[in-house]
Amino acid sequence: MANIKSAKKRAVQSEKRRQHNASQRSMMRTFIKKVYAAVAAGDKAASQAAFVEMQKVVDRMASKGLIHANKAANHKAKLAAQIKKLA
């Protein structure tokens, strides 16, 4: 455990940030799973609507540095290709 006051503060801030990031990451994964579920169900309209929402969330997380920009691009490209196949 930290003995210096500033180190204690940093430990508290770090834990708070870790919990917030975990929450944001979980929320992002939920949006991604919604798109996969809609694609698996074969519902093109629902999958496109879910994709639009997922895209916003993933881009926001990439811009904040929670995930790498390339990972966001990979998620979007992979899901867009699957939705395109539904036609």
From Swiss-Prot:
Entry keywords, A to Z: Ribonucleoprotein, Ribosomal protein, RNA-binding, rRNA-binding
Signal peptide per UniProt: none
The keyword Ribonucleoprotein belongs to this UniProt entry's keyword annotation: yes
Domain of life, per UniProt, equals: Bacteria
- Bias (Basic residues): 1-11
Q: Name one GO molecular function term.
A: small ribosomal subunit rRNA binding
A Pfam family recorded for this sequence? Ribosomal_S20p
Q: Return the Gene3D superfamilies for the record.
A: Ribosomal protein S20
Q: Which parts of this chain are annotated as the region Disordered? A: 1-26
Query: In Gene Ontology terms, what is a biological process of this protein?
Result: translation
Decide whether keyword Ribosomal protein is in the record: yes
Which cellular components does GO assign to this protein? cytosol; small ribosomal subunit
UniProt-listed InterPro entries: Ribosomal_bS20, Ribosomal_bS20_sf
HAMAP family the UniProt entry points to: Ribosomal_bS20 (MF_00500)
Q: Which family does it belong to?
A: Belongs to the bacterial ribosomal protein bS20 family.
Q: What does this protein do?
A: Binds directly to 16S ribosomal RNA.
Q: Which NCBIfam families match?
A: S20 (TIGR00029)
Q: What PANTHER family would the database entry show?
A: 30S RIBOSOMAL PROTEIN S20, SMALL RIBOSOMAL SUBUNIT PROTEIN BS20C
Query: What is the protein name stated in its UniProt record?
Result: Small ribosomal subunit protein bS20
The organism that produces this protein has a lineage beginning with: Bacteria, Pseudomonadati, Pseudomonadota, Gammaproteobacteria, Pasteurellales
- Underlying gene: rpsT
